[in-house]
Regions:
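Accessory "access/gating" subregions that flank catalytic or transport cores
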Residues: 1-55, 126, 130-137, 142-146, ...
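Alpha-helical support elements that line or immediately flank enzyme active sites
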Residues: 4-7, 12, 16-19, 232-256
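Internal maturation/activation junctions in enzymes
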Residues: 11, 71-170, 182-183, 190, ...
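Active-site rim segments in enzyme catalytic domains, especially the processed small/beta chain
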Residues: 23-27, 162-227, 237, 243, ...
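Short glycine-rich loop/turn motifs
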Residues: 38-40, 62, 149-154, 163, ...
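Short Gly/Pro-enriched turn/cap motifs at secondary-structure boundaries
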Residues: 40, 53-56, 143-147, 205-211, ...
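Short, well-ordered beta-strand elements
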Residues: 49-55, 61-68, 74, 154-155, ...
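Extended C-terminal subregions enriched in glycine
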Residues: 160, 208, 241, 250-311
Length: 343
């Protein structure tokens, strides 16, 4: 069981392995570790509630993007228009500035969780978007603080309506590439996402969880779960969640069409590791985006690149429940390995 891994011979082997290389992990780091049950946060978008896990992960970034986007009626433009891409990209840039400033282990940092998701804060951040031009640079906002690579996603559902949204990752490639003697598995390397700035909320400290990117999600309607989904791919994940929901809730696509539609990935700006990238960043688009849209986005100041490699744009899987019919619909990713199966 659990104790065999965290307190038994496996934990001793792992601790001895790191001691032999003068590493930072000790036996007590394993034996004292405890998983946590946490309450997800949510934002209502077009009458549906998206639930995401709170920091130290990046799930709240998807919620922040929707909190910003619900201040504009995207349906006044076609889904493939420059305007829709522009608003989504600028919302992403704003949310990711807050990732870099606030997202860390809440046991070690005061994080304005409620403030980040408030309607008032969403309106404030939306007001920073120029509808005609990409901003040269955004900074983090000031939400109110109350009380002063190798990733696998799986979703399953049973006949009773029980649904599970699960994601796990060793991070880059196969993780660290290090294997303790007699164990047969590689250590993950999520510690790469700590900041080495001691003043940063995400600073490297004993017993602390680093910022991480993996985020399973649920969509609810009137208090009932209707869709369990995820989209693998580092910083693409919250961007992908938002694009899937915009496709479905604003443009009426089904869950497979929502995943097949051409995506964007914006890369750049500040990072939770303390690294400050190009504030404008690069906007990667799939070849399916119309050429007219590409040229208009460039005219608006976005640094656009077309990338035909679908792997950059994430790996999507979903199950949607129709309670009235007592049935499910599944969706899978054409850009990566994935499948839908029923029993």
């Amino acid at each position: 069981g659990r104790d065999a891994f965290y307190k038994g011979s496996i934990a001793r082997r792992m601790a001895n392995y790191f001691e032999g290389m003068d590493g930072g992990l000790e036996y007590r780091d394993f034996s004292e570790h405890e998983g946590e049950w946490v309450e997800p946060g949510s934002v209502n978008y077009r009458g549906y509630d998206l639930y995401e896990l709170p920091p130290n992960g990046q799930g709240y970034a998807a919620l922040q993007m929707l909190s910003i986007l619900k201040n504009v009626d995207l349906k006044q433009w076609s889904r493939s228009s420059a305007e829709v891409f522009h608003y989504m990209v600028e919302a992403k840039r704003l949310a990711f500035e807050d990732i870099a400033r606030y997202y860390a282990d809440p046991a070690f940092a005061d994080i304005p969780l409620s403030g980040l998701l408030s309607d008032e804060y969403g309106r404030q951040r939306f007001a920073e978007i120029d509808p005609k031009q990409a901003s040269p640079a955004f900074g983090p906002g000031e939400p109110k603080l109350e009380g002063e690579g190798d990733t696998t996603y799986l979703t399953v559902a049973d006949e009773s309506g029980m649904m599970v949204s699960l994601i796990q990752s060793n991070y880059r490639g196969m993780g660290s590439g290090m294997v303790a003697d007699g164990t047969g598995f590689m250590f993950q390397d999520r510690g790469e996402l700590f900041s080495l700035d001691p003043e940063h909320p995400n600073a490297y400290e004993p017993g602390k969880r680093p910022f991480h990117t993996i985020i399973p999600a649920f969509l609810m309607k009137d208090g009932e779960p209707i869709m369990s989904f995820g989209l693998m791919g580092g910083g693409m994940q919250p961007q992908g969640h938002v694009q899937i929901l915009v496709n479905m809730l604003d443009y009426g696509m089904n869950i497979q069409e929502a995943g097949d539609a051409a995506r964007f990935l914006h890369d750049g700006g500040r990072e939770p590791t303390g690294v400050h990238g190009d504030p404008l960043g690069t906007l990667y688009l799939e070849p399916g985006v119309p050429e007219e849209t590409v040229q208009r986005l460039r005219g608006m100041g976005h640094n656009v690149e077309i990338d035909p490699r679908g792997v950059r744009f994430g790996g999507y899987q979903a199950i949607m429940r129709d309670k009235e019919k007592g049935s499910y619909a599944g969706a899978t990713e054409m850009r990566k390995d994935g499948t839908v199966a029923a029993y």
